[in-house]
Amino acid sequence: MAPQLLLCLILTFLWSLPEAESNVFLKSKVANRFLQRTKRANSLVEEFKSGNIERECIEERCSKEEAREVFEDDEKTETFWNVYVDGDQCSSNPCHYRGICKDGIGSYTCTCLSGYEGKNCERVLYKSCRVDNGNCWHFCKSVQNDIQCSCAEGYLLGEDGHSCVAGGNFSCGRNIKTRNKREASLPDFVQSHNATLLKKSDNPSPDIRIVNGMDCKLGECPWQAALVDDKKGVFCGGTILSPIYVLTAAHCINETETISVVVGEIDRSRAETGPLLSVDKVYVHKKFVPPKKSQEFYEKFDLVSYDYDIAIIQMKTPIQFSENVVPACLPTADFANQVLMKQDFGIVSGFGGIFERGPNSKTLKVLKVPYVDRHTCMLSSNFPITPTMFCAGYDTLPQDACQGDSGGPHITAYRDTHFITGIVSWGEGCARKGRYGIYTKLSKFIPWIKRIMRQKLPSTESSTGRL
């Protein structure tokens, strides 16, 4: 019986082999349900490590939340995600005129520089000198629908068509000396606690002044000239325009019989003062009416007094330029009116009185004074402010020019170049509350100045003329 049972079991086994073989491999549809690739689980160490962008989002597809865990910063996550999803839309640099591109999902955004607009910053909003000076470093001129930049004498127009590059070591308007961080910078001049305010006078002073300024460092005011005579020493200031021309106030010319010029000095008390430079000729504006120094003048102070207060001194021999002796740049009238005089501050300097009716300073003083709008200027003065004048100074701070500073420079800096914008002319006392310094408005006289500077080289004879 046993052999028969064994045979039966063998036959049953052999009969079942084909069915078993057919079930060893599952159909693909069924197999895929079991053989799907699952995301690799982080190990315990990985869970405590900071995110890794290569592991999370490059080796494997990640979600925005996972990317956020890596960067731990919303802005960085957004920047990465916009590129990760559909590539960098900014790779082709679609933004014109140096616009800044920001990638998005299926799009991008251009942030345009001032003066441009459009999806790609392709539209130019301005080609006008009245908007940011046309982006010109010095002078701007409107030409049809475009602008044209040019530079002050001694400068070359840069390859970008906007910047100005100094053509020499002593190009105009460049001061070599700058204040370090431990020194007060010109914009940070503050009120002196021991300011002396003397008895006020109702008379205008033709000899304006610098009160509570700071010592001008060597090379910081290189365009400063001082007018001196044999008896009074420094009696007025001036501005170097070129090797042979110095700008000053017309009323300074009548102060003395003899005039010499000193340049490059900051301390008159030192024994080794600079040489006295001889004057060849003086040009006084023909419309200037010298004030009568009498009580009758001070009571009336008629309209023409101190109007056209400008003169040019021609030297016998050229001024030698150096790091401490450099001319100020002469602006165009439009540039002075539309750009320079719309700045916050101008810079005045001189050897004038340290307080009202006080002695002149032995050291060159410098002060930054804010421009004052014309309406406020006219309301503040007891005397006429003509179109050839402008105001600058402080309403309440005791800082101003003073006696002996007349004829000196009012300078305005623009893009690190210093331009002459005015001449110290007159004022009602020194640093009085509610009173400002009055300056000759240089933009009114650019053609007159250029006409004189086109004159021939100095002759050997001295003379005084009116033009």
UniProtKB/Swiss-Prot annotation:
Catalytically driven reaction(s): Selective cleavage of Arg-|-Thr and then Arg-|-Ile bonds in prothrombin to form thrombin
Major enzyme class: hydrolase
Domain EGF-like: 86-122, 129-164
Active site residues of this protein: 251 (charge relay system), 309 (charge relay system), 406 (charge relay system)
Pfam family, one: Gla
Keywords carried by this UniProt record: Blood coagulation cascade activating toxin, Calcium, Cleavage on pair of basic residues, Disulfide bond, EGF-like domain, Gamma-carboxyglutamic acid, Glycoprotein, Hemostasis impairing toxin, Hydrolase, Pharmaceutical, Protease, Prothrombin activator, Repeat, Secreted, Serine protease, Signal, Toxin
Domain Peptidase S1: 210-454
All copies of domain Gla, residue ranges: 41-86
Family the entry assigns: Belongs to the peptidase S1 family. Snake venom subfamily.
Function field: Snake prothrombin activator that attacks the hemostatic system of prey. This non-catalytic subunit is functionally similar to blood coagulation factor V. It serves as a critical cofactor for the prothrombinase activity of the catalytic subunit, which is similar to the blood coagulation factor X.
Subunit field text: Heterodimer of a light and a heavy chains; disulfide-linked. Is associated with pseutarin-C non-catalytic subunit (AC Q7SZN0) in a non-covalent manner.
Matches recorded under PANTHER family: COAGULATION FACTOR, COAGULATION FACTOR X
Name of the protein in its database record: Venom prothrombin activator pseutarin-C catalytic subunit
Organism: Pseudonaja textilis (Eastern brown snake)
